[in-house]
């Protein structure tokens, strides 16, 4: 059994997310938000616009995946060429990248919510680890110098796909002030 599992519902950061993040930081120049240029904001934008790629799509109907790729390339190419004066995405390149991802992650993909639910039923201990802290939360942090996903403990259950009442203990680490990577304040 692998020591790491990847949810079949996991969204994937694509190389063009990193490119878009980099292009946007350059466009904003001195007024940027200090991105780490790892593609996180464009990734979340795609996730919530329902145009991101889910791991399960890699193992589904290839024609549907190619249709999704065509839709994404059409949308992204408007932004890439019109706003950033950057090269267009090629459908074949996006498809090939996704197939590389598929090959890399195939042994690790499963229904992680079911896996965790079974662990709960067996009385096993589950450790959920969050990131950053409340001052970087998009709803409760120092906006706009926040991250793109919720950093609060309550979202641990949501992200893991387990009922919130199964979280029995929360341990937090708090700092006296907020700090960040990139050009964050």
Task: Spell out what each predicted region is.
Residues 1-185:
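Non-transmembrane, aqueous-exposed alpha-helical and coiled segments at domain scale
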């Amino acid at each position: 059994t692998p020591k790491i599992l990847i949810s079949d519902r996991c969204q994937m950061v694509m190389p063009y997310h990193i490119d878009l993040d980099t292009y946007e930081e350059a466009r904003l120049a001195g007024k940027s938000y200090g991105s780490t240029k790892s593609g996180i904001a464009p990734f979340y934008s795609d996730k919530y616009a329902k145009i991101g790629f889910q791991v399960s799509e890699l193992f589904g109907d290839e024609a549907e995946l190619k249709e999704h790729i065509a839709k994404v390339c059409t949308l992204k190419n408007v932004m890439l060429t019109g706003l950033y004066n950057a090269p267009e995405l090629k459908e074949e390149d996006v498809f090939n990248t996704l197939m590389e991802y598929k090959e890399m992650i195939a042994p690790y993909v499963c229904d992680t919510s079911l896996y965790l639910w079974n662990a709960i039923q067996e009385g096993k201990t589950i450790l959920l680890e969050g990131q950053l802290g409340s001052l970087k939360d998009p709803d409760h942090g120092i906006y706009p110098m926040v991250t793109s996903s919720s950093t609060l403990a309550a979202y641990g259950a949501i992200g893991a796909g387990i009922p919130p009442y199964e979280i029995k203990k929360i341990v937090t680490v708090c700092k006296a002030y907020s700090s960040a990577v990139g050009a964050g304040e």
